[in-house]
Amino acid sequence: MTSRSYCVVGGGISGLTAAYRLRVATGDDVAITLFDPGDRLGGVLRTECVGGQPMDLGAEAFLLRRPEVPALLAELGLSERQRATTDARPLIYSQQRLHSLPPDTVAGIPSSATSVAGLVDDATVARIGAEAVRPLSWEPGSDPAMAELVADRFGEQAVARLVDPLLGGVYAGSAATIGLRAGAPSVAAALDCGATSLMEAVRQGLPPVAAGPVFGALDGGYQVLIDELVRRSRLQWVAATVVGLDRGTCGWTLVDDTGACWSADGVILAVPAPRLVRLLQQIAPRTVAAASRIVSASSAVVALSVPRDTTFPQNSGVLVASGERLRAKAVTLSSRKWGLQGDTQLVRLSFGKFGDQVASTASDDELLAWAVSDLAAVFDVTVDPVDVCVQRWIDAMPQYGPGHADLVAEVRAGLPPTLVVAGSHMDGIGVPACISAAGRAIEALQAEVAR
């Protein structure tokens, strides 16, 4: 009996998790071939040496209240590499001033009026305080853009100075590009269950008070996880782009950009939505119609190693409100957030949001100049970097717009048997969500192949 073979297209965390889950589920005799044209695996998980220290230049943290990453680390024997944030809190830069991030918010939506005093004007504070007595029209199951709901209930300043900074940091988007069910699912659920105001919904939707840190990371960076997934999955990496996909009577045939053909009993597509559209154009029209409506943003990260004695506040970083003169959308004071470990401090600045071309058009020199200028404007410090690394993420940040879950359901419903999809455009943009979606995809694939 011929052993089965599988092809995974895409070498990010979704593709690598899928390959590993396949290996665990199928054993040693199955061939797993992974296609990724890059010079490295990991996708938007990229660890580089900056100032002699490992530093993640893509995703850098995961929510500890979600179980997927700690569980996977434990399964791989990497639990001792998990580390957590310090107790440093982030700031918001608004009206050319630094403000504390208000406590008890959901995606930046406040749970009290008094907590945002000083960050928004008095009229907005009063509007938020009186919101509970205003009639709320809500249709259960609806999914408005976060900007639409928050502006209507709390005012435009609440959007620009509270919600936009948080969503810009997560999605490289804004409250206008993210739907409520993706950006604040607990708030949407509370409204569905009868909350009579946005304030009440936020209070009901607050996460349980955590006894410890909110975020985790890996000592040595995400490369530690990438390397172990590659080792455990025992995959064959083909550094090529899949350009053709066809289903025959005995499985799938894939064609890469060298002209080579590959056969598979099952296929996992762990690629961004635009590539999904190109690969499935002739195979899955329903999936293509839905995936083509998922748009993405680009961003660039400037990582700096700066002298150890550079004066930064005891905060984890800064989120930038909409309409400010800064070029950066966020600043991460990495050595404050994770603890000072080397002879220098590490800092990250992120540039680019949905709708702009900063990440693809600005030169490295321009990005560095903007980084130094923004640090001076925000912290009143003159920075002379010891080391610099620039990383661009083009079309890497899917925008979870209104109705995104319906699009994802359509993507899955339109797939032919033994072909599954995973990736950051499916069930969440973070690493835990990608791990979960990859596991779900492999479970579905195994059930279909076994029929």
UniProtKB/Swiss-Prot annotation:
Transmembrane spans: none
Enzyme class: oxidoreductase
Positions of FAD binding: 10-15, 36-37, 58-61, 242, 393, 429-431
Pathway: Porphyrin-containing compound metabolism; protoheme biosynthesis
Record-listed E.C. numbers: 1.3.3.15
GO terms, biological process: heme biosynthetic process
Cofactor(s) named in the record: FAD
GO cellular component: cytoplasm
Keywords: Cytoplasm, FAD, Flavoprotein, Heme biosynthesis, Oxidoreductase
Cofactor annotation remark: Binds 1 FAD per subunit.
Reactions performed catalytically: coproporphyrinogen III + 3 O2 = coproporphyrin III + 3 H2O2
Single Gene Ontology MF annotation: oxygen-dependent protoporphyrinogen oxidase activity
Compartments in which it is found: Cytoplasm
Family listed: Belongs to the protoporphyrinogen/coproporphyrinogen oxidase family. Coproporphyrinogen III oxidase subfamily.
PANTHER family (UniProt xref): PROTOPORPHYRINOGEN OXIDASE
Function of the molecule: Involved in coproporphyrin-dependent heme b biosynthesis. Catalyzes the oxidation of coproporphyrinogen III to coproporphyrin III.
NCBIfam families documented for this protein: PRK11883.1-1 (NF008841), proto_IX_ox (TIGR00562)
UniProt-recorded name of the protein: Coproporphyrinogen III oxidase
Protein source organism: Mycobacterium leprae (strain TN)
Source species taxonomy: Bacteria, Bacillati, Actinomycetota, Actinomycetes, Mycobacteriales
Gene name tied to this protein: cgoX
